[in-house]
C-alpha cells in the first residue's frame, strides 16, 4: 500500500511518542555518556502533541494503511545565533519504524519537511546525526545533505 505523509494532529501524539522513545533508545545505545535516557512515553506524547499545533514547528507523520510508520519533527528559526545561521529549519527528529525502512518513507518525510521549511521561509535545513549511525549519514548524503560541523565532547571528572 502507498505511504502518505501529512501534518500530525494531537491524535497522532501517542504513536509519535512511541517512535520517539525508540529513536531516543537508539541514541542511548550509541553512547550513554552523550545521550541521556530522558524521554518517557507520556512526556513525549505531551511534547509532540503540543508541537503539532505550534506556529513555528511541524510534526509530520508517514502513514501506511492508516498506521503511523514514521515521523519527523522540525522547528523554524529565523535567527539561530548559536549556529551563526539565519532562516533555518532545524530537523530535530526523523524516524521510521524498523520494519518499514528502505521503502522511501524517510525520503518522503524529508521531501515534505523541505516543503514545510520553504513555507516557513527557511533557506536551509540543518540536522544532526549520531557519528555511529552510518546508515542515516549515507541516507542524508544521498538526498543532498553534507557535513558542516563535527560535535565533540569531553567528559569532566
Regions found by a protein language model. Name each.
Residues 24-47:
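Conserved GNAT-fold acetyl-CoA-binding loop/helix
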Residues 61, 67-76, 90, 95:
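Conserved beta-strand in the GNAT
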Residues 100, 104-112:
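Conserved acetyl-CoA pyrophosphate-binding loop and the N-cap/start of the following alpha-helix
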Residues 45-61, 90:
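A short helix-loop-beta-strand connector motif used in the catalytic cores of GNAT acetyltransferases and
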Residues 118-128:
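Conserved GNAT acetyl-CoA-binding A-motif
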Residues 85-98, 150-153:
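Conserved acetyl-CoA binding element of GNAT-fold acetyltransferases
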Residues 1-14:
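Conserved N-terminal entry element of GNAT/NAT acetyltransferase domains
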Amino acid at each position: 500500500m502507498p505511504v502518505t505523509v501529512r501534518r500530525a494532529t494531537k491524535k497522532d501524539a501517542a504513536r509519535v511518542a512511541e517512535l520517539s522513545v525508540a529513536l531516543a533508545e537508539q541514541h542511548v545505545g550509541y553512547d550513554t555518556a552523550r545521550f541521556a535516557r530522558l524521554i518517557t512515553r507520556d512526556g513525549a506524547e505531551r511534547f509532540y502533541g503540543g508541537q503539532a499545533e505550534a506556529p513555528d514547528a511541524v510534526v509530520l507523520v508517514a502513514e501506511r494503511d492508516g498506521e503511523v510508520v514514521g515521523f519527523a519533527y522540525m522547528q523554524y528559526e529565523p535567527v539561530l545565533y548559536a549556529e551563526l545561521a539565519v532562516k533555518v529549519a532545524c530537523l530535530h527528529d526523523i524516524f521510521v519504524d524498523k520494519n518499514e525502512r528502505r521503502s522511501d518513507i524517510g525520503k518522503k518525510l524529508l521531501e515534505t519537511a523541505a516543503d514545510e521549511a520553504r513555507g516557513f521561509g527557511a533557506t536551509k535545513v540543518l540536522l544532526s546525526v549520531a557519528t555511529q549511525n552510518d546508515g542515516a549519514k549515507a541516507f542524508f548524503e544521498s538526498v543532498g545533505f553534507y557535513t558542516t560541523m563535527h560535535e565533540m565532547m569531553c567528559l569532566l571528572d
